[in-house]
Amino acid sequence: MTGKTRGRRSSERGIALIITLVLVAILVTLVVEVTYSTHVNVRIAATFRDDLSAYYVARSGVELALAVLRMDFEEDQEDVSQGKQSTRQDHLGELWANLDEAVTAAQGLEADLFGGGQLFLRIIDEDRKINVNLINQQSTYPIVERIFLDSEISEDYRSAIMDWVDENQEETDPGGAETRFYENLDNPYPCKDGPMDTISELRMISGHDEATKKTFEAFEGEKGSGDKGKWTLEDLLSAVPGRGPNINVNTAPGPVIMALHQDIDHLQVQEALQDRTADPFPRVDAFRDYFNNNFGIADLPPHLAVHSEYFRIESVGI
């Protein structure tokens, strides 16, 4: 074998090795790409599965809450028709008001209650609050004013709310804000000049930064909201359509009860809440008589009730 032949074969082996390495590199790249693509697709499918599962868990919560409210309404109607009570009643001792605790307890007893998912569910009585859409009415304004004074929320913010829900372009003194103010913002938008659709609109109104951060101390025995168990402004104000509801005195938080009259103090509210827990007020007249007979306060505002019409369902599936 000549040296020329050996050199050619060595060169051929070198070329074959290079081709092999290139093919291996291509195959490795393809395998990595296919593996990554498969992993991504699996993750997408798993995320879709989990999202779909969470959605149906949340939907189940909504249906459960509606069934509980329907059952409560029908029981009230039956009691009224049988003369057991003179009018419908909704209070904090009923199942709908404690549904969050009942659902949590049920999931603790039955780990697979929602097919491996978890449900956080509660029903919030919107009639326990003050309808902020009625702030410009003579009977509602003083109640909102006392709520704001108690938490040291500025008068300017109260005026800005009045301008937000009224139907004119005249600014309320002091501190009111109409479309001219909002259109000069970095991200302009018009003033609503009409009833709020949701209470979250409070965060669109001039002066909201400080006001919506304010908290109200919960009275003894109240749950409050959030980690610290205090009430926020959105816990005390609602935004409901039309004329709006009456305030349910059987479910209203302490700060709302105290805002009903300028002479109601903290101790009186605490006593009323304790008595209400033991024996909810059967009629509005009973609530008025309670404050008149016990504390000499006779001129409570109109638009009070002992039952509720508007509820909000919060259902979160995981």
Task: Please state what every model-predicted region is.
Residues 2-318:
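Compositionally biased linear targeting/interaction segments
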